[in-house]
C-alpha cells in the first residue's frame, strides 16, 4: 500500500460540506411606490431593495426604477387598456416618489382595432413641454363608414391620409407645447387629444378609434426636488421651508449695540 495521507483524517472535515445558506431576503427592505397627485390612487405597490451596506446605498438602487401600471389601477376605473410608466426620482423615508416616464396601449387593444376594409393612419411628433420635457407622441386612427354608405370598404385616398396626418401632428404639437408635463398627463388620462383629433378630421374623412397610442420620454430637465414634491401634492409645505431658511433682514438703528446681560 502506498504511503500517504489518510484522507479521512484531513483537517477541516469533508471538502464538499454544504455552506450555511443565508436567505437573501433577510438583507432586503420593502419600499412603498407613490404615484404623482394627478392620479386618484397614490399607493401603487411595493418594491424590494437590498439594505444600505457600506458604500452601497439603498436609495441609489431605487432611483431610476421604472414601474408600468395600468390606468385602471391608478384611477380605480374599468377602462384598462392604457399603461403608464412611472420612474422613481427620489426616496423619502420608505416612500419612492415617482414621475411620469411614458405611456402605452396594451397589445390586445391595439390588435382589436386593426381590421380589414379600413385605412390605418399613424403619425408621430417630437414636442417639448413648457417645463422642458421632450416627448415623442405616437397617434393612430382608423377610417370608418359614412352613415349612408353601402360599400363594404372605407379606404381613404392618399391625399386625405396626408391631410389627416398633418392635422394629427398639429393638434399633438399644440396640446403639448402650451402646457407643462402635469397638464399633458391630465390630458392623456381621458385621452382628450385623441377626441380632439377625431373631431377635427371629420370634415376630411370620418375616423374612429383615434388614440395617442404611445408617449416616450426623450429628454428631461435637471432634477429639482421642489418640482417633484409639487407633483406629489407636497409643494406648499416644502416651499415654505425653503423660503424661511434664507431669513429676513432686521431693521436696526445706526450705532445699535445689544444690551449687556447681567447673568448668562
Curated annotation (Swiss-Prot):
ADP-ribosylated at Tyr-155 by PARP1 in presence of HPF1. There is a cross-link at residues 34, 249 (Glycyl lysine isopeptide (Lys-Gly) (interchain with G-Cter in SUMO2)). PROSITE patterns: RIBOSOMAL_S3AE. Transmembrane segments: none annotated. Residues 232-264 are annotated as: Disordered. The modification Phosphotyrosine is found at residue 256. Residues 242-255 have a biased composition (Basic and acidic residues). Changing residue 155 to F: Decreased ADP-ribosylation. The modification N6-acetyllysine is found at residues 34, 56, 249. The modification ADP-ribosyltyrosine is found at residue 155. The modification Phosphoserine is found at residues 236-237, 263. InterPro entries: Ribosomal_eS1, Ribosomal_eS1_CS, Ribosomal_eS1_euk. Component of the small ribosomal subunit. Mature ribosomes consist of a small (40S) and a large (60S) subunit. The 40S subunit contains about 33 different proteins and 1 molecule of RNA (18S). The 60S subunit contains about 49 different proteins and 3 molecules of RNA (28S, 5.8S and 5S). Identified in a IGF2BP1-dependent mRNP granule complex containing untranslated mRNAs. Binds with high affinity to IPO4. Interacts with DDIT3. Part of the small subunit (SSU) processome, composed of more than 70 proteins and the RNA chaperone small nucleolar RNA (snoRNA) U3. Component of the small ribosomal subunit. The ribosome is a large ribonucleoprotein complex responsible for the synthesis of proteins in the cell. Part of the small subunit (SSU) processome, first precursor of the small eukaryotic ribosomal subunit. During the assembly of the SSU processome in the nucleolus, many ribosome biogenesis factors, an RNA chaperone and ribosomal proteins associate with the nascent pre-rRNA and work in concert to generate RNA folding, modifications, rearrangements and cleavage as well as targeted degradation of pre-ribosomal RNA by the RNA exosome. This is Small ribosomal subunit protein eS1. The gene is RPS3A.
Amino acid at each position: 500500500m502506498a504511503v500517504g495521507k489518510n484522507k479521512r483524517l484531513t483537517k477541516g472535515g469533508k471538502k464538499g460540506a454544504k455552506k450555511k445558506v443565508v436567505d437573501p431576503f433577510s438583507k432586503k427592505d420593502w419600499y412603498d411606490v407613490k404615484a404623482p397627485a394627478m392620479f386618484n390612487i397614490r399607493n401603487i405597490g411595493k418594491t424590494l431593495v437590498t439594505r444600505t451596506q457600506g458604500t452601497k446605498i439603498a436609495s441609489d438602487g431605487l432611483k431610476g426604477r421604472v414601474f408600468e401600471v395600468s390606468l385602471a389601477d391608478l384611477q380605480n376605473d374599468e377602462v384598462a387598456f392604457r399603461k403608464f410608466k412611472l420612474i422613481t426620482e427620489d426616496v423619502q423615508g420608505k416612500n419612492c416618489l415617482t414621475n411620469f416616464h411614458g405611456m402605452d396601449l396594451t397589445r390586445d387593444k391595439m390588435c382589436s382595432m386593426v381590421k380589414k376594409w379600413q385605412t390605418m393612419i399613424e403619425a408621430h411628433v417630437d414636442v417639448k413641454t413648457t417645463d422642458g420635457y421632450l416627448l415623442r407622441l405616437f397617434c393612430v386612427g382608423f377610417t370608418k363608414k359614412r352613415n349612408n354608405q353601402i360599400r363594404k370598404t372605407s379606404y381613404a385616398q392618399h391625399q386625405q391620409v396626408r391631410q389627416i396626418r398633418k392635422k394629427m401632428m398639429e393638434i399633438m404639437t399644440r396640446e403639448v407645447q402650451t402646457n407643462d408635463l402635469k397638464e399633458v398627463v391630465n390630458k392623456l388620462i381621458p385621452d382628450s387629444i385623441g377626441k380632439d383629433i377625431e373631431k377635427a378630421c371629420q370634415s376630411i374623412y370620418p375616423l374612429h378609434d383615434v388614440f395617442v397610442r404611445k408617449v416616450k420620454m426623450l429628454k428631461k430637465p435637471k432634477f429639482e426636488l421642489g418640482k417633484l414634491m409639487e407633483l406629489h401634492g407636497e409643494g406648499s409645505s416644502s416651499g415654505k421651508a425653503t423660503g424661511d431658511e434664507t431669513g429676513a433682514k432686521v431693521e436696526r438703528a445706526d450705532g445699535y449695540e445689544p444690551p449687556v446681560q447681567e447673568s448668562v
